[in-house]
Every structure is written in structure tokens, then in C-alpha cells.
Amino acid sequence: SKGCVPATIAIFDGYVRVGLSKGEIDTLGKEGARDFVAKVSRRDIAPILANASLPEPSLRRLKLGATTVSATLLVADMLKIPVFVTGGIGGVHREAETTFDISSDLTELSRAKNTVVICAGVKSILDIGKTLEVLETLGVTTVGYKTDAFPAFFTRDSGFKPSTLVNSAT
């Protein structure tokens, strides 16, 4: 009634697809259970579409890909889709000071110009404080809607605060 159109983004039959049918979503789930679906981040889009330069020979035949937040946001932003909703974003992993394991979701959030992301915060297995620091460094605003608590995916309050609070969507 508000003009919102759900459009699942994925790699399907070797193409970036925006707006999958229920049957296509079911196919992704079933084939994913058989390891026939690639996890596709921003960096993986070109190789999976080229279908030739992936390091693992068995992956060269893959024509299905579940897009991460970074890949989904890249596609949504290119198409000027104004809102992208997801469960949680990636972030800085615990012990990142030695592993340097930081999700490309954070960089992509700083690049998006046409799309905002609505989510339940950072995945709770991550270092939320460090993730918020990286988002601040990258110039990404975090917004709490009717709350001053930053969520931790499964919980409402991570112990951290968003950078901005809003009480109305208008």
C-alpha cells in the first residue's frame, strides 16, 4: 500500500538478478544446501559472472550466487534502489588487530550514494565497538529509530549508541 516492492538480489543463471520469484528463491535454498551456490561479495561479482577465473575448478560451473550485503548494496545503489533491508551487516571481527578480518560491507556502506540500509545492527559475533569506529572513520552515519541503543542483531541493545537518533520516518 506504500509502494514498496520486495526484490531479492542474487546471481541466477549466471546473471545479476533483481527480483526473484518464490521458485527461484527456493532453488537458491535447495542448491545452497548442496554447495552449488557461491557466496558473492563485491569482489566476487565479476569472476562469478565471467564463470572462468575462480580459483576452485568446481566453482567455475557455478551459476548461482547468494549476494552478501556488500554485493547487494552495490547492485541496489547502481540501480538507485532507495532502501535495502537486511538482517545484519558484517563488520570488524574479534581479534581483527591480528587477523585484519574486516567485512567489505563497511567499505560498501561508505560508497553508497543512492541507497540506505536498514538492518538489525552488526552481527553479534563481531566486535561491535570496533565496527562502529570503522564506520565513523569511513563517514557512515548510524541511525537509531526511536532508540538510542545500537542493536546487536538478536538483541536490542549492544551497549553502544548510534551516531544519530530519529523519532519519525518523515
List the predicted regions and their residue ranges.
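Acidic, glycine-rich active-site loops and adjacent beta-strand->loop/helix elements
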Residues: F12-V16, G88-V92, A96, G121-S124, ...
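Internal active-site segments that recognize and position negatively charged phosphoryl groups
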Residues: G65-V92, G121-L138
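Glycine-rich anion-binding loops and their surrounding alpha/beta cores
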Residues: N114, I118-T170
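Glycine-rich nucleotide/cofactor/substrate-binding loop typically near the N-terminus or early
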Residues: S1-L54
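Short coil/turn connectors at secondary-structure junctions
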Residues: K2-P6, R42-I45, L54-P55, L59, ...
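Flexible, glycine/proline-enriched loop segments at strand-loop-helix junctions
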Residues: I45-L64, R94, K113-I125, G159-S163
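A glycine- and small-aliphatic-rich helix-loop capping segment at beta-alpha/alpha-beta transitions
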Residues: G23-F36, G91-A112, V134
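Short acidic, glycine/serine/threonine-rich loops at helix termini
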Residues: V18-E24, R94-T99, D127-T131, F153-S158
